[in-house]
From Swiss-Prot:
Gene3D superfamilies the record matches: RNA 3'-terminal phosphate cyclase domain, RNA 3'-terminal phosphate cyclase, insert domain
Family per record: Belongs to the RNA 3'-terminal cyclase family. Type 1 subfamily.
Species in which this protein is naturally found: Pseudomonas fluorescens (strain ATCC BAA-477 / NRRL B-23932 / Pf-5)
Protein name (database record): RNA 3'-terminal phosphate cyclase
Any one annotated GO CC term: cytoplasm
Cellular compartment(s): Cytoplasm
Listed EC numbers: 6.5.1.4
Length: 342
């Protein structure tokens, strides 16, 4: 008998559990009841960006919800039919625009008509994938699966000021399985440093560190100096384009953190992934799992199991008739496979 209500514990996995569960609730029509939302975080319950995701999801499918308020650790979400259209959402802080978009996008791919979604808030938030990651790494894989999505950055928004905006255009699409076992040949690499309202030497020092540690040619290193009205804000982005995928690694500037240390954080992440031999790094792995499950299958290799990946598996299997298996191929490579249950 089809399960009409899915109950989840949101203590493990943080906001990722909530976002995936909202997407799947909209897609399956199953009521979501979730408790202990972000209970293990320093600021438990729904923050502004989580609340925006809930309210946006409710608008897209005409859901009835209870517990949709700041600080709430309990939520009931009863979805209706998904509706495409023209949507605009404002987080009101530097909360992540990209995480709100990723909550809505799977459902809008199944809408009966196209959608345009504008979201204002933070486009470059250290606790979320920046819009560049979606554009360069995630969306190209979604398009390989058949998803028809375009994404534009209209205005940068850093923490704490926010004020950024993105706009997505989504056509109804049927996703097909994707298998990413290998990266293929390296096609190119580059780095760029965004800086707003900060001295020019900050971006220059970050890129110099990339040159020194990764030996990237200087013509592949680009400082991007934004108008100070967007700031203060700084992020270093490292891109590696391979035959089968592109990966992006980020280092966010912080008060009292030297530019060289910002660069080191992104460089260390990139090196760990490059040395592992796995196809996708941990963040892309986590974000490919839901589209693969909706496609009814797929696989990838990634360096290791993470809390987000594990919690995403748990949520997906609670909603969909799929089985997701993870097995180590070596000390540095984990294979993740998604199968539809007959």
């Amino acid at each position: 008998m089809k399960q009409d209500v899915v109950e989840l514990d949101g203590a493990i996995g943080g906001g990722q559990v909530l976002r995936s569960a909202l997407s799947l609730s909209m897609l399956t029509g199953k009521t979501l009841r979730i408790h202990n939302i972000r209970a293990r975080r320093s600021r438990p319950g729904l923050l502004r960006q989580h609340l925006t995701a809930v309210l946006a999801a409710a608008q897209v499918c005409g859901a009835r919800s209870t517990g949709a308020e700041l600080g709430s650790q309990v939520l009931s979400f009863e979805p209706g039919p998904i509706r495409g259209g023209d949507y605009r959402f404002a987080i009101g802080t530097a909360g992540s625009c990209t995480l709100v978009l990723q909550t809505l996008l799977p459902a809008l791919l199944r809408a009966p008509q196209p959608s345009r979604v504008s979201i204002s808030g933070g486009t470059h938030n250290p606790l979320a994938p920046p819009v560049d990651f979606l554009q360069q790494a995630w969306l190209p894989q979604l398009r390989r699966m058949g998803g028809r999505v375009e994404l534009q950055l209209l205005r940068h928004g850093f923490v704490p000021a926010g004020g950024g905006e993105l706009e997505a255009f989504i056509q109804p699409s049927e996703l097909q399985p994707l298998h990413l076992q290998e990266r293929g040949a390296l096609l190119g690499s580059r780095a760029w440093a965004l800086s707003a309202g900060l001295p020019e030497h900050v971006a220059e020092r970050e890129l110099r560190r990339v040159h020194d540690r990764l030996q990237l040619p200087r013509e592949q290193l680009t400082p991007v100096l934004l108008d100070e009205e967007y700031g203060p804000g700084n992020v270093l982005l490292l891109e590696f384009a391979f035959e089968h995928l592109t990966e992006l690694f980020c280092g966010f500037g912080q008060n009292s953190l030297r530019a060289e240390k910002v660069a080191d954080g992104a460089i260390d992440q990139a090196r760990d992934w490059l040395d592992s031999g796995a196809a996708v790094a941990e963040h892309l792995a986590d974000q490919l799992l839901l589209p693969m499950a909706l496609a009814g299958g797929g696989s990838f290799t990634t360096p290791c199991m993470t809390e987000h990946l594990q919690s995403n598996i748990r949520v997906i299997e609670a909603f969909l008739p799929v089985r997701i298996e993870a097995r180590p191929l070596s000390e540095q490579v984990l294979q993740v496979q998604c199968h539809a249950l007959s």
